[in-house]
Amino acid sequence: MSFWKNKTLAEMDTQEWESLCDGCGKCCLNKLIDDETEELYYTNAACKLLDPKDGHCVHYVQRFNFVPSCTQVTVDNVAELTWLPDSCAYRRLHLGRELPSWHPLITGSKEAMHIAGMSIKNKVTCETKVKYMEDHIVLWPLKDIE
Protein backbone atom coordinates (compact mmCIF):
# COMPACT_ATOMS: atom_id res chain seq x y z
CA MET A 1 0.00 0.00 0.00
CA SER A 2 2.54 2.58 -1.16
CA PHE A 3 -0.01 5.27 -2.01
CA TRP A 4 2.71 7.96 -2.07
CA LYS A 5 4.28 6.24 -5.09
CA ASN A 6 1.03 6.23 -7.06
CA LYS A 7 -0.45 9.61 -6.15
CA THR A 8 0.68 13.19 -6.29
CA LEU A 9 0.48 15.23 -3.10
CA ALA A 10 -2.61 16.93 -4.52
CA GLU A 11 -4.35 13.58 -5.09
CA MET A 12 -3.96 12.38 -1.51
CA ASP A 13 -6.89 12.34 0.88
CA THR A 14 -6.61 13.80 4.37
CA GLN A 15 -5.67 10.50 6.02
CA GLU A 16 -2.93 9.81 3.47
CA TRP A 17 -1.61 13.36 3.75
CA GLU A 18 -1.47 13.22 7.54
CA SER A 19 0.24 9.82 7.48
CA LEU A 20 3.11 11.28 5.47
CA CYS A 21 4.17 13.20 8.56
CA ASP A 22 6.72 11.00 10.31
CA GLY A 23 6.33 12.93 13.57
CA CYS A 24 10.01 13.87 13.73
CA GLY A 25 9.12 17.25 15.29
CA LYS A 26 11.77 19.21 13.37
CA CYS A 27 9.19 21.57 11.88
CA CYS A 28 8.24 22.56 15.44
CA LEU A 29 11.71 23.80 16.29
CA ASN A 30 12.31 27.53 16.49
CA LYS A 31 14.34 28.80 13.60
CA LEU A 32 16.41 31.95 13.17
CA ILE A 33 17.26 33.85 10.01
CA ASP A 34 20.50 35.83 9.81
CA ASP A 35 19.59 39.45 9.01
CA GLU A 36 22.62 39.91 6.78
CA THR A 37 22.92 36.59 4.95
CA GLU A 38 19.29 35.40 5.23
CA GLU A 39 20.70 31.98 6.18
CA LEU A 40 18.33 29.76 8.15
CA TYR A 41 19.42 28.25 11.45
CA TYR A 42 17.58 25.61 13.45
CA THR A 43 17.58 25.69 17.24
CA ASN A 44 16.91 22.95 19.74
CA ALA A 45 14.19 25.14 21.27
CA ALA A 46 10.89 23.42 20.56
CA CYS A 47 7.38 24.81 20.46
CA LYS A 48 5.78 24.80 23.88
CA LEU A 49 3.19 22.29 22.61
CA LEU A 50 5.73 19.71 21.44
CA ASP A 51 6.24 16.64 23.60
CA PRO A 52 10.04 16.19 23.68
CA LYS A 53 9.75 12.46 24.35
CA ASP A 54 7.90 11.54 21.17
CA GLY A 55 7.75 14.60 18.91
CA HIS A 56 3.98 14.98 18.90
CA CYS A 57 1.99 18.14 19.42
CA VAL A 58 0.06 17.79 22.67
CA HIS A 59 -2.81 19.88 21.25
CA TYR A 60 -2.58 19.06 17.54
CA VAL A 61 -6.24 19.65 16.66
CA GLN A 62 -6.43 22.96 18.57
CA ARG A 63 -2.79 24.02 18.02
CA PHE A 64 -3.74 27.23 16.20
CA ASN A 65 -5.71 28.38 19.26
CA PHE A 66 -2.58 28.01 21.40
CA VAL A 67 0.03 29.02 18.81
CA PRO A 68 -1.53 31.27 16.14
CA SER A 69 1.78 31.42 14.25
CA CYS A 70 1.85 27.63 13.78
CA THR A 71 2.10 26.79 10.08
CA GLN A 72 -0.05 24.07 8.58
CA VAL A 73 1.75 22.27 5.77
CA THR A 74 -0.59 21.93 2.79
CA VAL A 75 -0.27 20.97 -0.84
CA ASP A 76 -0.71 24.67 -1.63
CA ASN A 77 2.17 25.94 0.52
CA VAL A 78 4.69 23.07 0.65
CA ALA A 79 6.77 24.58 -2.17
CA GLU A 80 7.08 27.87 -0.27
CA LEU A 81 8.05 26.30 3.06
CA THR A 82 11.76 26.18 2.33
CA TRP A 83 12.47 25.92 6.06
CA LEU A 84 11.12 22.37 6.15
CA PRO A 85 14.06 20.01 6.68
CA ASP A 86 15.29 17.96 3.72
CA SER A 87 14.22 14.84 5.61
CA CYS A 88 10.56 15.97 5.66
CA ALA A 89 8.32 13.59 3.67
CA TYR A 90 6.24 16.46 2.27
CA ARG A 91 9.37 18.23 1.05
CA ARG A 92 10.95 15.03 -0.27
CA LEU A 93 7.87 14.01 -2.28
CA HIS A 94 7.34 17.56 -3.55
CA LEU A 95 10.93 17.51 -4.85
CA GLY A 96 10.44 14.10 -6.49
CA ARG A 97 12.42 12.14 -3.91
CA GLU A 98 11.44 8.85 -2.26
CA LEU A 99 10.54 8.37 1.38
CA PRO A 100 13.62 7.39 3.39
CA SER A 101 14.17 3.83 4.59
CA TRP A 102 13.51 4.84 8.22
CA HIS A 103 10.11 6.46 7.53
CA PRO A 104 7.22 4.97 9.56
CA LEU A 105 5.23 4.23 6.38
CA ILE A 106 8.12 2.03 5.26
CA THR A 107 9.04 0.43 8.59
CA GLY A 108 5.63 0.28 10.25
CA SER A 109 6.77 2.17 13.35
CA LYS A 110 8.58 5.30 14.47
CA GLU A 111 11.34 3.35 16.19
CA ALA A 112 13.59 3.23 13.10
CA MET A 113 13.30 7.01 12.80
CA HIS A 114 14.39 7.46 16.41
CA ILE A 115 17.24 4.96 16.06
CA ALA A 116 18.44 6.75 12.91
CA GLY A 117 18.54 10.00 14.90
CA MET A 118 16.02 11.66 12.61
CA SER A 119 13.64 12.91 15.31
CA ILE A 120 13.75 15.49 18.10
CA LYS A 121 13.36 12.77 20.72
CA ASN A 122 15.41 13.70 23.80
CA LYS A 123 17.26 16.48 21.92
CA VAL A 124 15.21 19.58 22.65
CA THR A 125 14.24 22.03 25.33
CA CYS A 126 10.97 23.94 25.59
CA GLU A 127 11.06 27.41 24.06
CA THR A 128 9.65 28.87 27.28
CA LYS A 129 12.88 27.89 29.07
CA VAL A 130 15.16 29.58 26.52
CA LYS A 131 16.51 33.05 27.19
CA TYR A 132 18.67 33.55 24.07
CA MET A 133 17.69 31.58 20.97
CA GLU A 134 21.13 32.26 19.47
CA ASP A 135 22.64 30.06 22.18
CA HIS A 136 20.56 27.10 20.99
CA ILE A 137 21.55 26.85 17.32
CA VAL A 138 22.10 23.23 16.29
CA LEU A 139 23.00 21.36 13.10
CA TRP A 140 21.41 17.95 13.70
CA PRO A 141 17.99 18.89 12.23
CA LEU A 142 19.71 19.32 8.86
CA LYS A 143 20.80 15.68 8.79
CA ASP A 144 19.15 13.71 6.01
CA ILE A 145 19.73 10.03 5.37
CA GLU A 146 18.10 7.64 2.98
Swiss-Prot record:
InterPro entries: Puta_zinc/iron-chelating_dom, UCP006173. It comes from the Bacteria. HAMAP family: UPF0260. PANTHER family: UPF0260 PROTEIN YCGN. Belongs to the UPF0260 family. This is UPF0260 protein Ssed_2516. It comes from Shewanella sediminis (strain HAW-EB3).
